[in-house]
Amino acid sequence: MAFAIGTSPIKRDFTRIKISVASPESILARSRGEVLKPETINYRTYKPERDGLMCEKIFGPTKDWECYCGKYKRVRYKGIICDRCGVEVTSKSVRRERMGHISLAVPVVHTWFFRSVPSKIGALLDLSTKELERIIYYEVFVVINPGEPGRKQGLKMMDRLTEEQYYQIITEYEDNQDLDDDDPDKFVAKMGGEAIKALLKRLDLDSTAKELRRILKESQSEQKKADALKRLKVVEAFRASYEPYSKEAKKKEEFSLEPPEPYRYEGNKPEYMVMEVIPVIPPELRPLVPLEGGRFATSDLNDLYRRVIIRNNRLKKLLDIRAPEVILRNEKRMLQEAVDALFDNSRKANAVKSGDSNRALKSLSDSLKGKQGRFRQNLLGKRVDYSGRSVIVVGPELRLHQCGLPKDMAIELFQPFVIRRLVERGYAKSVKSAKKLIDRKDPAIWDVLEKVIEGHPIMLNRAPTLHRLGIQAFQPVLVEGKALQLHPLVCTAFNADFDGDQMAVHIPLSQEAQMEAMMLMLSSHNLILPQSGKPVTVPSQDMVLGVYYLTKVRKGARGEGNIFANTEDVVIAYNEGEVDLHARIFVRYDKPRDEKNDVLSFIDAIPESKPEKRKWVKEQLEAKTLMATTVGRVLFSQVMPETISFINKVLDKKTAKDLIAHVISKVGTVRAEKFLDDVKGLGFNMAMRGGLSIGLSDAIVPETKKRYIKEAIKNSNKIIKEYNTGMLTENEKYNKIVDVWQNVTNIVSDESYQTLRKDRDGFNPLFMMLDSGARGSRNQARQLTGMRGLIARPQKSMSGQPGEIIENPIISNLREGLTVLEYFISTHGARKGLSDTSLKTADAGYLTRRLHDVAQDVIVTEDDCGTTMGIHIRRDEEEVAGKVKFHDKLRGRYVAHDVVDSITEQVVLKAGDLITDEIAEELRLNVGVTDVMIRSVLTCDSKRGICAKCYGTNLASGRQVDAGEAVGVIAAQSIGEPGTQLTLRTFHQGGAAQGGIAETEIRSQYEGQLEFENIQMVQSKTFNEDGAEEVHDIVIRKNGVMNIVDPSTGKILKRMIVPYGAKMNCKDGDMVQKGSLLYGVEPNSTPILAEKDGVIKFVDIEKGVTYKEESDQQTGHVQRVIINWRSRVRTVDIREPRIQLLTHHGELIASYPIPIKANLHSEDGATVHAGDVLAKVPRDLTRIGGDITAGLPRVTELFEARNPSDPAVVSEIDGIVTFGSQRRNNKEVKVKNAYDDERIYLVPIGKHILVNEGDEVRAGDPITDGSISPQDILRIQGPNAVQQYLVNEIQKVYQINAGVEINDKHLEVIVRQMLQKVQVEDSGDTHLMPGDLIDKTTFKDVNSKIQGKVRVSEKGDARNIQEGELYAKEEIGRLNRELRKNNRVLVTFEPAVPATSRPVLLGITSAALQTESFISAASFQETTKVLTDAAVEGKTDFLAGLKENVIVGKLIPAGTGLKRYRSLRISTANLQDSYEPSQRAYQEDEYAKKEDGEIAIDD
């Protein structure tokens, strides 16, 4: 695709790009001549052959300003065309842009339009791909005009004929062939490209479209409708490319009384899909490269072009000598195949292979597609000049904004700047001599270099660049050696360590680039992580350890109990060696301080022999004039900013992180930078002073371990005994044993931690490293000194869940050493971790790429979209483990509606207020505020991009987000980066299973009164271990709810769903305390219980048919398990295994369906009591630690909006459940509401039903088990519900599985993009098509355009209007008034019907491909399909997103590239109006569609 048309220069300031199907005329207009020979260069002279594929006459000279024969040399002959060789004297660079062409002997079908799915040509001609192929490859004839002979034979246009049939007609009606080709009576049938071209020429698109629309409206057959819709889409795409020549002319004609003149269209004609001329791309894009030894490496395209030319020339010769039809036909077919291979060689099974190596040649399509294609390799990712890379080492003495740049690198990178300075200062006379100075490494150059780099920032980048902090700017400092030096605090942002990592250096050259690097990218301006708003420059490892060591307390240290007048005295005393670093001392200090309550215990530091002193100190402490602290903390306070309170507690990593966040928000980045540098220095210094190192003796195994292990072995033996006697099933035994060991592991883990804590007064080096957060986790400490515990089995379990837990734990720890068997079991996890890492990194990277592509054009485009919508944030949701707190979700958002305190009924916040950190903190403490409606990206009404108010504050700065901020890209980075990080982190666990003791006792989190809803209970008697009888209330109704209510206000504090089978420990109306037991649950299985006393009857429970007896190999005990009988039984009489509960007289009380995998716990005919267990359904408990390996596929599943593999059946209405009859293998579940609206759901038998007969369900409640499909939520509860569901579910994976904090607004940005489209259901009177996916805003615009218009049903005596067309109501009214005056028949009309649509949830891949911009979509995936579709439609790309602009080489329309910033006018006349954005630019921005400067691309 080239842009130069004829000789006109390329327009550089274009604002949009249009793509269309190239007509033969446009190919010829771009061509500089016809390529006639297949030769490339002469083998003797190595000069291009004339008229060949490299011809200088066509493509331009190979040497600058020199013609082929050498008659004209030098630039003075510029533009002259040599009379001898015909070559234009010009720069050789034109060989990159000049095109040629090949005139084909017969028309050839373009493979893209024929092989695309659905086939464009097939859709227009209503032919299947098979049929088309037979015509195109010269197997059958197709009738183009039946003429007289055809009519006699009963042939119609488009009928296919074999060779025999064709020649039979030709011979039978010989005279007919003498008629003129245009004669309607002449019989014409052709094959190949000619036939297709002739058929396409005869197509009338308008009447085809009308006919297809008629079929859509009138046809009864669904299949016919679907086919018509498929064809109509292609027809309408072609029609869309036909723009009327001028809107004004059209308007003028519409109501004039003269007949309209015929329209002149400039659009894609269907026959353009068949080519008579093919373009030859410029030779520099398919070069011949000389290798040593006189051989040449050639681009594959040259081979492909050569085949086309050879076959074309041979065909021309054969036509000239009038060769037999058979030979001609074969040659034409070969030409078609050669052109197919040139355009797309990868689609065909028999692709053209290269001669020497057996690989397929790279065709034009292949050079666009994929990672190595033109888009991704050359346009989106370019190599950069002025860059270098080297290994990094730590630079502990650097300031935060500095980095160390090796001198040798610096002189190379800044060479042009240095040369200029050397010449200016007179060190060198010319550039050449300056270069020599540099090569000689003359001492003079170093001073010059120092001056040059002063104030010239450089950018450092570490691959993989997962988020924007992967590239930061620094002020370079020249260093000796060859390694870059990096500040230790920026390592977290780069995810760098110093084990051999390399980093790249880039130099911003222009003044603007340097400014942006200084202002926006300097490392000291990027202290906060954009993904969560938390600081990223946090001390780690040695620094944390140093600061932790510094602030620790040691009892009995030298100088403890001393009282100092001020902090300066403390420092002097320490320097003089009078007090130790960790001594507990008292200092007179009356400013604010941040301390824990344990400082009163410091009074012990004063000996008991001095009671007066003790008493006085205590009084002073209570009066807050004296402060109990340590020497180290005073030293730390010396580096603190003055306005921050004294930190009087031990600083571990978490406290340090919070402190840094506090400092940044209070004193700003400049002061914070100094503070961070000081903390770094102090940390390293103290880590050195402390001399911390760990030895073998520091890992202390707790004494109590043996006792706990003994106990656990006893318990597990007891469980095995119970299992042997048949009291437990295999599954229950497994789960119970796992629980026992999990408990012991946790206890031993705590014990070992406490042992370390007590050792040496908490100064055990291993403990300090763990406790400070410098290195290692509690889990690793457990493995070192406790016990390794249970290990996960890496392969999939029986139930298909990843990784079960091996029930024999590893009892040893790494300090004691493992036995051979234990070591072997351990290797499992370690190896799995390493293999996972390499596999999952690619997945996470691909997820990031899709996220970027879907969100790349979400930019902040306006200040306020004016919507009143928003989303609700409720307080009670925060109780779920790992969820973000209520006030954290509000921080940095704007309020949508007034916030009212439900207790005092006062307005706390007004609509439009920003919730700052302080306000969020107030809301957290104000219990009266339970529900806040905030503005959200999900409900933003901006036409393009989003508005600043809906987005809230920029997390990285804490201020309102600026116009032009590329929030979509930031969102994609924020979600993608942790995904990659987490997958890289799985193997640190070493496969040790953690977590997962199933919750068996549920306790109250609040104090209050209980209120039961829908809870039905029965009393059940059980016997405990001693044989004593116990009575329990057992819940026998699903979906029962227990509320904890504040008795004073009546407000519900907590709402909990009580599971079926729960053992209640409380009654309705009870007062409960915080922590009191509410109910117990069986964690490993769900029971099926008898509701009343009675007798049991088994129905359809037959041995070997619906259940099998599984005897355990070890115990021989038999379990009865319901099996999947549907797959085996084909007899009609089996319905479904169920247990009936009868009275003693045989009357039915209840019937319980028993699902597959359930274990029977009762006997046929036995008497049971209310609450007895009839059967148990085991839960698949595969409890394994937080490892995002399970999480990443879940995130992908949610972002791709895939339906889960085993979806739940969901109720669509509120109503009461009843069970219907059984059909085949399905059971009917009916839900009926108060308005007699009934829905029937068919549930496969054996799937566990969660509701009982008579239960009340709400719309959206699941009826069966399984995951709820997001599509169902969208259908039943609407877009808002599904948006919230997706955001919450993705957050769950990140927070609970991985402990990563991502702000909701990033997820909202992506989810918004997934719901941007609607699907047209009924097109009404618009030009839309049913089933079309279009943008919400476009859909609204289309409907608003036909408002106030009417559709003419009968035109009466009016002339210039069409029936069925739309016109403005006033115009028709005016026309009717005129007609009434003249007593003519009036126009009858009806109002225009708007289109209707439904919201669609698209996965991120399809959403990215559905983008408005074809350039962006083509560079993402399915390049050829996207380009084909766009070309047919004649699409225009307005270059609104980021990606399109990068591809065409313009500044991106975000950040400083926004139109409003680029058209600033700077003037100095009067300082007050020194700059003003032009008003026009502000309004129209980059997004206004401009009429001028369009570039056309032809396929």
From Swiss-Prot:
Annotated spans, Disordered: 1475-1499
Known EC number: 2.7.7.6
Biased segments, Basic and acidic residues type: 1482-1493
Any single GO BP term: DNA-templated transcription
Cofactor: binding comment: Binds 1 Mg(2+) ion per subunit. Binds 2 Zn(2+) ions per subunit.
Origin superkingdom: Bacteria
InterPro entries referenced in this protein's UniProt entry, alphabetically: DNA-dir_RpoC_beta_prime (IPR045867), DNA-dir_RpoC_beta_prime_bact (IPR012754), RNA_pol_asu (IPR000722), RNA_pol_N (IPR006592), RNA_pol_Rpb1_1 (IPR007080), RNA_pol_Rpb1_3 (IPR007066), RNA_pol_Rpb1_3_sf (IPR042102), RNA_pol_Rpb1_4 (IPR007083)
Residues noted as binding Mg(2+) in the record, renumbered to the chain: D497, D499, D501
Binding site for Zn(2+) 1: C67, C69, C82, C85
Binding sites annotated in the UniProt record for Zn(2+) 2: C865, C940, C947, C950
The entry's keywords: DNA-directed RNA polymerase, Magnesium, Metal-binding, Nucleotidyltransferase, Transcription, Transferase, Zinc
Entry's family note: Belongs to the RNA polymerase beta' chain family.
Main function: DNA-dependent RNA polymerase catalyzes the transcription of DNA into RNA using the four ribonucleoside triphosphates as substrates.
NCBIfam families the record matches: rpoC_TIGR
Subunit structure and binding partners: The RNAP catalytic core consists of 2 alpha, 1 beta, 1 beta' and 1 omega subunit. When a sigma factor is associated with the core the holoenzyme is formed, which can initiate transcription.
Annotated HAMAP family: RNApol_bact_RpoC (MF_01322)
Name listed for the protein in its UniProt record: DNA-directed RNA polymerase subunit beta'
Organism: Chloroherpeton thalassium (strain ATCC 35110 / GB-78)
Phylogenetic lineage: Bacteria, Pseudomonadati, Chlorobiota, Chlorobiia, Chlorobiales
